[in-house]
Amino acid sequence: MDVVFALGGSVLMPKEGASTENIQNYAKAFKKLKEMGHRVSVVVGGGNTARQYISVAREFANESFCDEIGILATRMNSMLLISALGKDAVKQVPENFKDAEIILNMDKILVMGGTHPAHTTDAVSATLAEFIDADLLVIATNVDGVYNKDPRCNENAVKLDKINTKELLEITGSSSMSAGSSGVVDPLASKIIDRAKLKTIVVKGIPEEILASVTGNHNGTTITP
């Protein structure tokens, strides 16, 4: 199966900083999926690294410039994961989908970050999935699925086990799109998922759930066309 993962930068690089064990555990999960015969692509977010830099830069620069900072942060995080993957990855971060496809055709795990200003890595992963005609898009984030309301500020929010892409659009329609913003799925990614009719799964961004999203026994949200 051809699978694209959107790996949240905040789960790879939590607030407490880089952890060798944490990054190694993600690398092991992606390696295992490759060993099982799946073609694996990972788009890594900027997470806390991006937000820290952007919060300072925003005092001096516009949103477009802050977007560029965020893109660089995603590529630094990507390099960390690439280093842990060793021979299973190519030691460079592609900046466009054609170069990404070349890496996939080398039978390597593809790892990349952001590509364009105003595009989150969720949107990049959805576009990549459409570009390579992937079988599945998995969004691994710091929330364990899609909720009817933001669970981080609504204690009555209800997790949705299964929704369709139109329902996803309704839920994500009012999300923020400023540089460094974070949400379960951003509006642009939702539109691409709907347009491309991508089967998508949103899971808690831990190695166990990443594996489970492909084997079929995950605890997240399944989004169908």
UniProtKB/Swiss-Prot annotation:
Pathway: Pyrimidine metabolism; CTP biosynthesis via de novo pathway; UDP from UMP (UMPK route): step 1/1. One of its GO terms (cellular component) is cytoplasm. ATP binds at residues 9-10, 47, 51, 141-142, 147, 150. Keywords: ATP-binding, Cytoplasm, Kinase, Nucleotide-binding, Pyrimidine biosynthesis, Transferase. Its main location: cytoplasm. It comes from the Archaea. Its EC number is 2.7.4.22. InterPro entries: AceGlu_kinase-like_sf, Asp/Glu/Uridylate_kinase, Uridylate_kinase, Uridylate_kinase_arch/spir. Transmembrane segments: none annotated. GO terms for molecular function: ATP binding; UMP kinase activity. GO terms for biological process: 'de novo' CTP biosynthetic process; UDP biosynthetic process. It catalyses: UMP + ATP = UDP + ADP. Inhibited by UTP. UMP binds at residues 46, 67, 115-121. It is found in: Cytoplasm. It holds the Pfam family AA_kinase. HAMAP family: PyrH_A. Belongs to the UMP kinase family. Homohexamer. Catalyzes the reversible phosphorylation of UMP to UDP. This is Uridylate kinase. It comes from Methanococcus maripaludis (strain DSM 14266 / JCM 13030 / NBRC 101832 / S2 / LL). The lineage of its organism: Archaea, Methanobacteriati, Methanobacteriota, Methanomada group, Methanococci.
